[in-house]
Amino acid sequence: MHFDPHRAASMIDSLETDAATKASMLKAFKRRIELFGGNIHFFREPFTPVSLTGTQCSLYCKHCNSHYLRHMLDGSGGKLYSHAGLLKEKGAEGILLSGGSAADGSVPTYAHAMDILKIRQEMKLKISAHTGIVDDLQAHMLSEYLDMALMDVIGDDETIHDILGIDACVRDYEDSLRALSSAGIPLAPHIIVGLHNGKLRGELKALEIVRKFNPEVVVIVVFIPTKGTALEGIAPPRLEDVVKVITKARGMFDIPLSLSCVRPGGRYRSMLDKYAILSGIDRIAVPTRNAYEISRQLGLNIVEIRKMCCSYK
């Protein structure tokens, strides 16, 4: 399929948004073509998440309130190894370790080190994990078995205090990235757009922090107003705000830029995929039908990656 640069400009120009946003999108899209050509990668089957803490979490974050833990496999109480074995039998290439946070913002992955090492050695699965905040010792322990560290990077102290409820600050997230990087663990930092009540608050600062540590991939997550949480009545971020973060990231990094599977559904998701593609995203997890349609209209070459997380190159 032949990529048509004029088609991209025409599609961006037809969007119902302001001229400055359109200009930033076109610039970012051209940059993305320079870096990755006409290929766009679609990850239709992300790794299955396994919660190492079951549904337990010491935090009651306003955007989550343990909701997402209830939709993961329960790997607590010695069940991690058996779950990994079943996933391997089903053809899984890797596993995503997650779970509730301790009061300090860390996820106790290291408490399951022996099982994780066995899984990696015996089943040859790729191991990625949501690490949370870590210190040097924890990062060193993680380096024994992690193939990729997935870390939400928050760039605003008030968001950390008021939304996550953690007695920490932006510096702690930067120090965690430094510890993980120094331990030699490949990084796939996650930037959550709209985490602060659906508004931008620290996302661009988070990108500046991430740039210091040479990540493998940068992943863009979009806040989901979730039923049963304090933020269920909040609107998701404006598409223009998501575009602002994506285009900023595309200008800062020459590495893959992924749109996470964690993003709102429905018509918003469909429109988001369109805006994201036109803003320089080169990979999407669980793409919508609209993502396929827009990519074909642009003449992009769709490369489907099966049974793999979008945080991997």
Walk through the language-model features, giving the residues of each.
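Hydrophobic faces of well-ordered beta-strands that scaffold small-molecule active sites
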Residues: F42-R44, T48-V50, I95, I127-A129, ...
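Short beta->alpha linker loops
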Residues: Q56, I133-V134, P287-N290
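Short, flexible active-site loops
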Residues: I185-L195, F223-E232
